[in-house]
Amino acid sequence: MDKFWWRAAWGLCLVQLSLAQIDLNITCRFEGIYHVEKNGRYSISRTEAADLCKAFNSTLPTMAQMEKALSIGFETCRYGFIEGHVVIPRIHPNSICAANNTGVYILTSNTSQYDTYCFNASAPPGEDCTSVTDLPNAFDGPITITIVNRDGTRYVKKGEYRTNPEDINPSSPTDDDVSSGSSSERSSTLGGYIFYNHFSTSPPIPDEDGPWITDSTDRTPATRDQGAFDPSGGSHTTHGSESAGHSHGSREGGANTTSGPLRTPQIPEWLIILASLLALALILAVCIAVNSRRRCGQKKKLVINNGNGAVEDRKSSGLNGEASKSQEMVHLVNKESSETPDQFMTADETRNLQNVDMKIGV
């Protein structure tokens, strides 16, 4: 039992260590815009997104800045926060990215957790893939923050960047998701590193029918092994020459704008480990109780004999091959008279003759 509790304490320590580490995957900068993914899944709230960009000496980008980055090849397959919206920049249509739409795809339901996009005003123009080696505005803290660049290089720093207590100790679990993409690149996360496959980009093709806007809540299935999908909620995209805050792009095949499957909550890892330990403890307790009952619950046989009769021990076999159960036996031996019927007849005749003699004498 002591060994069990030692293992349980060790497991809880490992859970706490895993919660005290943050991995930040960063893409190249396109006109100062870049994508940041935390711990390989959608796990950044809107308040944390602003704090994270601030830690990188950046800000949340505006829609105009996103459109400018899109025009030079910035493309991902991940939802992320910008100023006032949750978007995906798309150049090439893909059924599992932005519901097969192109342009800056806007998700109208933005109450959950996503990735974030940041804008660094001091970044060089065009595409910049220089490795990020610092988190300049982070303050002191116990968290181990690891910055993973596109080329696999890492920068590790102890500190903290979150200012909202709910972001530090979230009350609701985050959702696991697929890996992120980057501008003009499709990426996949493996062991904390990001591998990129470049492909050529082309500017958006305008639609001959002019501006349009669609709205729909239809849902299309998506597979996790192919790329990111659209979280729950209706979404929309715009096309053509619209005002600031809408996207410019093309739509392929006239397909309706759709959103992906519902985001299902995931049980935290520490809760799974704790439940497993409790279940193991319960199983061990039941086994110990059953074993103790088998040892202490055996019955002994009681034999009462007056010494004149023979006692035959009987054993009853249990069902299904179980051990035979002891029986409590009380054997009573009655002593029978040893006189024979002839002896009884002789005694009666003697008494009768005595009575006759007495009568004759009288």
UniProtKB/Swiss-Prot annotation:
Subcellular location: Cell membrane; Cell projection, Microvillus; Secreted
Span list, region Stem: 225-269
Gene Ontology MF annotations: cytokine receptor activity; hyaluronic acid binding
Record keywords, A-Z: Cell adhesion, Cell membrane, Cell projection, Disulfide bond, Glycoprotein, Membrane, Phosphoprotein, Proteoglycan, Receptor, Secreted, Signal, Transmembrane, Transmembrane helix
Coiled-coil residue spans: none
SUPFAM superfamilies, per database record: C-type lectin-like
Residues the record lists as binding hyaluronan: 41, 78-79, 105
Disulfide bonds: 28-129, 53-118, 77-97
Cytoplasmic side: 291-362
Signal peptide: 1-20
Modified how: Phosphorylated; activation of PKC results in the dephosphorylation of Ser-326 (constitutive phosphorylation site), and the phosphorylation of Ser-292.
Transmembrane segments: 270-290
Listed Pfam families: Xlink (PF00193)
Entry's Gene Ontology cellular component terms: apical plasma membrane; basolateral plasma membrane; cell projection; extracellular region; lamellipodium membrane; macrophage migration inhibitory factor receptor complex; microvillus; plasma membrane
Record remark on domains: The lectin-like LINK domain is responsible for hyaluronan binding.
Name of the featured protein: CD44 antigen
Source organism of this protein record: Papio hamadryas
